[in-house]
Amino acid sequence: MAKKGTRIVVTLECTESRSVPSSEKRSAGVSRYTTEKNRRNTTERLELKKFCPELNKMTIHREIK
C-alpha cells in the first residue's frame, strides 16, 4: 500500500498589502497564492517572492495557517 502523501497545499499571503493604506493600492484586498510544499523537506513556513497585483510590484509572500 502507498504511504500518505507528504505534499500539502499551503496558502501564501502578501506581507506588505496589510500595512499599506488603501489609497496607495490599485484595489482593496490582499494578494494570495496557493502552492504545494513537501512537509519532510520544508518544515518551517514557506516564504516566496511573488508578484502582488494590489501593489503592482514583487513582494514577499508568507505561508499562512
From Swiss-Prot:
Gene Ontology terms for molecular function: structural constituent of ribosome
InterPro entries assigned to the protein according to its UniProt record, in alphabetical order: Ribosomal_bL33 (IPR001705), Ribosomal_bL33_CS (IPR018264), Ribosomal_bL33_sf (IPR038584), Ribosomal_zn-bd (IPR011332)
Keyword field: Ribonucleoprotein, Ribosomal protein
Any Gene Ontology biological process: translation
Transmembrane annotation, as ranges: none
PANTHER family: 50S RIBOSOMAL PROTEIN L33, CHLOROPLASTIC, LARGE RIBOSOMAL SUBUNIT PROTEIN BL33C
Stated name of the protein: Large ribosomal subunit protein bL33
Native species: Prochlorococcus marinus (strain NATL1A)
